[in-house]
């Protein structure tokens, strides 16, 4: 996996923010699935759709968290090597 650095002034926060558009889309889909499920909680298809959307959202957030953590760890290792 490679990460393309957009410019010299990027930060971990800006890297994390690149995930925000996808997160907003997934959050909207998750909310819609939950609203449908709340109207008919005994429908197994709606439950499966909600669980699927929740899983997608969780995986996306984990990818965001892991990406930022990996970059942070690499940066920390570089700093440690300069000491």
Curated annotation (Swiss-Prot):
It comes from the Bacteria. It is found in: Secreted; Cell surface. SUPFAM superfamilies: MxiH-like. Its main location: secreted. The keyword Protein transport applies. Keywords: Plasmid, Protein transport, Secreted, Transport, Virulence. InterPro entries: T3SS_needle-like, T3SS_needle-like_sf, T3SS_needle_YscF. Pfam families: T3SS_needle_F (PF09392). GO terms for cellular component: cell surface; extracellular region; type III protein secretion system complex. GO terms for molecular function: identical protein binding. Changing residue 43 to K: Decreases needle tip complex formation. GO terms for biological process: protein secretion by the type III secretion system. Component of the type III secretion system (T3SS), also called injectisome, which is used to inject bacterial effector proteins into eukaryotic host cells. MxiH/SctF forms the external needle filament that protrudes from the bacterial surface. Belongs to the SctF family. The core secretion machinery of the T3SS is composed of approximately 20 different proteins, including cytoplasmic components, a base, an export apparatus and a needle. This subunit polymerizes and forms the helical needle filament. Interacts with the needle tip protein IpaD/SctA. Interacts with the export apparatus components SpaP/SctR, SpaQ/SctS and SpaR/SctT. The helical filament defines an inner channel with about 20 Angstroms diameter and has an outer diameter of approximately 70 Angstroms. Deletion of the last five residues prevents self-association and yields monomeric proteins that allow biophysical studies. This is Type 3 secretion system needle filament protein. The lineage of its organism: Bacteria, Pseudomonadati, Pseudomonadota, Gammaproteobacteria, Enterobacterales. The gene is sctF.
């Amino acid at each position: 996996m490679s990460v393309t650095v957009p410019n010299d002034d990027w930060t971990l926060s800006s890297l994390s923010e690149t995930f925000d558009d996808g997160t907003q889309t997934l959050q909207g889909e998750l909310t819609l699935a939950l609203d449908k499920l709340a109207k008919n909680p005994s429908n197994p298809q709606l439950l499966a759709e909600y669980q699927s959307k929740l899983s997608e959202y969780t995986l996306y957030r984990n990818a965001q968290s892991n990406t930022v953590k990996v970059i942070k760890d690499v940066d920390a290792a570089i700093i440690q090597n300069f000491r």
